[in-house]
Every structure is written in C-alpha cells, then in structure tokens.
C-alpha cells in the first residue's frame, strides 16, 4: 500500500486492501472438467437468481466488500485569494467532493466571511467541517466520512473565544 492509499484509508475515503489466500496445490483434489462446468453453471444460476431477487427488494442489501473504485475520490485543494472564490468551494461540495481550504492568504475578516459561507453550505448539505491546521480546513459532503481528529488546541484562528472578540 503506497503512501497516498494510506492517507485515503486514514481519512476514511478508501478501504484497506485484503490479502489473498493462496491454497497449496497438494490440498486441491483433481476435478473432472465436466463436473466443474456443471457446478459453475449451477452457481452462476443461483447468483443470477439472487441478483434478480435483490433488484426486486430494492437497496436493502449492502455488500460486505465494496468493489474497488477505479476513479477514486477527488479532493480539491483551494487557497482562495478573495471572498468570491467561496462559491467555487460550495459548488465542489454540492457535487459531492471534499475540499481542503487554506485561508492563509486572506485577511482575518475575509477569512471569517469565507468560513461562515462555506460552513453554511456544509450545514445545508449535512456535511462536516474539520480544522486540520492553523488556517486550513477540510469541508466534506455527507457522502464522505472522516475518521480521526487533529489536536488544534492553542490555535487562536477560528477559536470560538477569539471569534467572538472580533464581533
């Protein structure tokens, strides 16, 4: 598992890959080819019946192991230089993409307004807001789960006490 995959697993955006179990050749009994084909056909028919039944039942059945998504989840990284870029962040969130926002280039008042706007968008979408650095935030839509936490105690930016002093 490479470094990027480990980060995605940590953030809950991907699942850990399972190791394959390889059987010894000695343990496997020889199989008659025609018997194998018959069993394969019967098994396929049973699977097709289950799929038809599950299609009729709706989405109440959830697979235990998800299939690997070849596209992956795109995380947008944005360092806005003006307040007008808040709408771009909102569009990404509405489209289902998580966004990491670095507010270090903005004035304090503009950064507050940006946080207010994007936080409102996240709230309306039932998403999540995570502070991951001094002026760096992770905004995620409801379809993206975030596990873990980063300790930002002692950081005054966007601290509720500090935030109230500016009002």
From Swiss-Prot:
The keyword Cell cycle applies. One of its GO terms (cellular component) is cytoplasm. It comes from the Bacteria. Pfam families: SepF. Its main location: cytoplasm. Keywords: Cell cycle, Cell division, Cytoplasm, Septation. Coiled coil: none annotated. GO terms for biological process: division septum assembly; FtsZ-dependent cytokinesis. InterPro entries: Cell_div_SepF (IPR023052), Cell_div_SepF/SepF-rel (IPR007561), SepF-like_sf (IPR038594). It is found in: Cytoplasm. The keyword Cell cycle applies. Residues 25-64 are annotated as: Disordered. Residues 39-51 have a biased composition (Basic residues). Belongs to the SepF family. Homodimer. Interacts with FtsZ. HAMAP family: SepF (MF_01197). Cell division protein that is part of the divisome complex and is recruited early to the Z-ring. Probably stimulates Z-ring formation, perhaps through the cross-linking of FtsZ protofilaments. Its function overlaps with FtsA. This is Cell division protein SepF.
């Amino acid at each position: 598992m490479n470094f990027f995959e480990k980060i995605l697993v940590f953030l809950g955006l991907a699942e850990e890959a399972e190791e394959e179990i390889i059987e010894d050749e000695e343990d496997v009994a020889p199989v008659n080819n025609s018997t194998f084909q018959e069993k394969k056909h019967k098994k396929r028919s049973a699977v097709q019946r289950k799929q038809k039944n599950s299609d009729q039942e709706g989405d109440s059945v959830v697979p235990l192991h998800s299939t690997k998504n070849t596209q992956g989840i795109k995380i947008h990284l944005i360092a806005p230089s003006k307040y007008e870029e808040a709408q771009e962040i909102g569009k990404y969130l509405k489209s289902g993409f998580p966004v990491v926002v670095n507010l270090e280039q903005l004035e304090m008042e503009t950064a507050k307004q940006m946080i207010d706007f994007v936080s409102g968008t996240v709230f309306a979408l039932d998403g999540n807001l995570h502070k991951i650095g001094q002026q760096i935030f992770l905004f995620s839509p409801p379809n993206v789960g975030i596990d873990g936490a980063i300790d930002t105690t002692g950081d005054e930016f966007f601290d509720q006490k500090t935030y109230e002093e500016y009002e």
